[in-house]
Amino acid sequence: MKSKVYFTRIITPEKVLEMYEVLGKELIGKIAVKLHSGEEGNQNFLKPDFWRPIIDKLNGTVVECNTAYEGSRNTTEKHLKTIEKHGWSKYFDVDLMDAEGPDMILDIPEGKVIQKNYVGKDMENYDGMIVLSHFKGHPMGGYGGALKQLSIGCASSYGKAYIHGAGESEKIWTADHDLFLESMADAAKSVHEYFKGNIVYINVMKNMSVDCDCCAVAEDPCMDDIGILISTDPIAIDQACIDLVYASNDKGRDHLIERIESRHGIHTIEAASALGYGSREYELIEIDD
């Protein structure tokens, strides 16, 4: 059966909230809000004001995990300062899920490459999750969307290295590339299934650079904004975003497509689909004003 993906070309904070209401999926209990806090120096990440209506609606807690590379977010102290500087703690409760160990380990018995996922231990404190993704390019994954947020985004600092290294954290930058992409698909499955259906995905196709929000020095957006998508299927929503980029007549789309293709970005979606926790087949339902 095709997954439903709702789509609007209007990109406003209020429209994000409206799309959640259109989806008709009520998240229950204490809700983790997974988003990207933005590397210091990055100009493209989506700011707190943009997400405020949906987070306030859910009374959600913004959750993040420390990075596994040098920068402004690789230690708890630096990351909290960056979160404050970027305005997140001004509006929301913020939880660095891996600020204190030990990591929470999610088993992935059906994982193709990795059978364990190391996530921030505070994940156990939440009943559900909304994954707020800024869709854009990525220097390693080709693109960043819902699957990246589920995997790398929810992984602890060690867990990020473990995924990048395809199960060998010391190979963080040297592992076989497709094995890294398949590890992301494995890890994403464990988080998606952990919340037992009490999870929603929103992808925003705005400020689309070839670079991720994890880059302190990032290229400016290369193509015009496209819209907001929402679904309960992380695979379908990422596939829909990829398809919208390819369908665009924007003169800058080729630059983003080159980034996706040169990093074999579609393979993460292929690997996730093979694991069966979502579908690449979807019905795109456009919501008009």
Q: Where in the sequence are the language-model features?
A:
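Extended, low-polarity segments enriched in aliphatic/aromatic residues
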Residues: M1-D289
